[in-house]
Amino acid sequence: MELLQLDDFLGKPLRLEGSLAGWQQLFWDNTLVSQKDASASDDNDFHHQFELQNGESIIECKLTGNLSWQPFLISYQALVNNQVIAQGERNEKDIERQTPHTPIEPEKRFSLIGLVSLGMKALKSAKLIKVVLASASLAAYSWLFSFQFALALIACLMFHEYGHVRAMKYFGMKTKGIYLIPFLGGLALSDEKINTRWQDVVISIMGPLFGLIMSLICMVAYWITGEMFFAGLAVFNALLNLFNLLPILPLDGGHVLKSISFSMNSKLGIVLCAGAAIGGVILSYSLGLTLFGFLLIMGCIEIIFEWKQRHHSHLLPLDRYGQIFSFVWYVGLVASLMGIIWYFAGTGDTLLSLPLQILGT
């Protein structure tokens, strides 16, 4: 990831890149001039030095400083012939706001839902596709339920996607729009790239959080009016948001758990992450949630295969507090949505019990 960029260092840009593994690379005018191997030292201090030719004279250039990952803070000094020409420090907020000066290669993912997402991104410039997909979603849900219920469910999905949009705007990102995908939910797009794992967590999890709020509102409306319409809306909206929290990319849960696991660099953290995944699978099967447990296994396998490549990511990892907070936030959302589904399954109504039956398939 890009740690530092000086736009004018002897008339050319000076860029420092590095990873949590310890390696660093220094580029002057996009040419590699110094590097530090991952195994070179565990010290937070860094020192890069290179020479430039100016006619018959030699210009000695140095970049020194201190780098701390948790919490992220880098202080630096740039020197030319032992004279300081630039100095300062950067924290996580600076990383969030930066625009990387090198193109970011898209991550390679193979997933059926991922292919749908890729197709959506390819069509995102066509405004007509929004109308087409919204109509297709309305027709699909009308076929399963009533026309009125389909409209209400789509409104819930829009509220879910609005949660993503609000999070993007919080980080100052421009949004492209919201697309509805029949039976899969929706997709909120942005023209800009994220720079930190925390941004990925917040943007991903705000959709299901807004979805939970909508289900709770419908639940309260059911208690007040006794209308089964609101009960059905609450439970099926909870089911859609719960599926979105599965650890399968590019679903919201996949992004959240990937950001947590990819931010861990200690053996203890890896063991705890693996233990939590195994515990989640065991709990799912013990509660009769066969489908949920199976998809949880598939998602964890996908993340495990990609885990070794985590140091090649341009995203700033979560600190220890961010990892714990994100995990508790995620588990709390899953438990809340499951609670809603179990509550309505306990009413004895056949239709309201359907989401729980689906999870136990």
Predicted regions and their residues:
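Hydrophobic transmembrane alpha-helices and their immediate loop junctions
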Residues: 2-13, 18-23, 36-56, 64-361
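Amphipathic alpha-helical segments
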Residues: 26-33
